[in-house]
Structures are given as C-alpha cells and as structure tokens.
Amino acid sequence: MSGGRLFVIAAPSGAGKTSLVRELLAREPNLRVCVSHTTRKQRPNEVDGRDYHFVTVPAFEALVAADGFLEWAKVFDNYYGTSRGALAAAFGAGHDVILEIDWQGAQQVRERTHDHVTGLPGCTGIFILPPSRAALAQRLRGRGTDDAAVIARRLADAVDDMTHHAEFDFVVVNDDFGQAVAELQEILAGRGDALRSGRRALAPLLADLLAPPSAAPSGGGGPPPRL
C-alpha cells in the first residue's frame, strides 16, 4: 500500500470535529477523509457517502465477518467502522488520509499500523477538546435532534471519552475555530512540536472536563466521538 500519511482525529461528540475536518479538506488539496460505515440512522442534513456510508446491521456484520474493516466499534448501540478498501484506494492515489473515529477505533488503528502485514504507515493521533464542559453541553443541546435522555447519556459518557486524550500525539482545543484549524494545519505540516510541549497548560481545562458529574458545573459534559 503506497501513499501518504495517516492522521486519526477523535473527539467527544459536540466538540466540532466534523466541522474542523471539513475546513481542513477545503484548505489541503492532497488530504482525503476515509468515510466511515455506520448502522446509525441518517440525519436530515447528512448525505450518504459524504458523511457516512449508512448500512444495515446485517450488511455491517457481513463486512466484519469478511475482515473488511481496519477498525470497528459499537458506540451508543450503533456500529461504526473504517473500510480497508476505501483506505487502500486513498493511499494508492498518494493522498494523506484522515480517519474521523472514536478512541476505541484509534486504539485498533495504532495496533494495526505497527503490523507490517497491513502495509499501513504509522499514524498521528489528534484529540479535539471543547473549550469547557458547559460549551459542550450547549453544543449538544443546540443540535435539536436528540431528546433530554439521550443528551444526558452522552454528557455522562463524555468524561470517559476524554480520559483517553493522553493516548493521542496532539490535543487541540476547539475554542476559536480559526485557531483550531491553523493548529491542525501545523500538525499536518509536521510543525506541531509547540502544541506537544504546551499540553501542561491544558491542566485546568482538563480538570474541569474530567471532573465527576456531581462536581462539575451545571453546564454538563459530552459523549463518544462519532455520532
């Protein structure tokens, strides 16, 4: 498998990962995103093949049985997975590739990119954080697509998602959208050392985001990534 570099981007739902990736794709002509498969119900503003490949549970399970996924996971009772074929096609064309996946998928990708049988390059992991717990809760409620029980469940699960931030090479805070995009471009260009060395400055933010729900401000938290 020839081609460019592999970047894995994960975040709790509501952190703005998808918007950031779309802006990166608009600015970086050699960058491609590997569109995931999912059994989740398609939302009104989503396009099949652009946002996800929407498939049935039997179709997804058939791909799992055929070893058709580089990684897959079950999140919020729905399956998500990255197709080996789609990834191979992007690398075959010489593109750099982004995977928008959750921390579970990122763990699988890290393991398999060190497996010489797959022929995959090593991957660079990037975790997106919201600027605060309250901001994350507000973004989730602002979607208007989920009821209060679903939002509460996602907010409760966000703490667990964000405890995995240290497993990634870089952490980017999506407070100012333009700045976050610029930081991602620096990482893609191989100039992310300043971000790596500045992670200690995130300690106060992480203390807020990772506090138990009872100790957190009333604003809330967030959920698993690929929603």
Can you say where each PLM-predicted feature lies in the sequence?
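Post-Walker A helix-loop "phosphate-sensing" segment adjacent to the P-loop in P-loop NTPases
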Residues: 25-34
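Walker A/P-loop
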Residues: 18
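Extreme N-terminal, non-catalytic leader segments
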Residues: 1-6, 29
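Conserved phosphate-donor/acceptor-positioning beta-strand/loop module used by diverse small-molecule
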Residues: 97-103, 118-142, 173-174
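NTP-dependent small-molecule kinase module
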Residues: 145-146, 160-227
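P-loop (Walker A) phosphate-binding loop of NTP-binding proteins
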Residues: 10-12
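ATP-binding Walker
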Residues: 15
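ATP-dependent small-molecule kinase phosphotransfer cores
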Residues: 38-107, 223
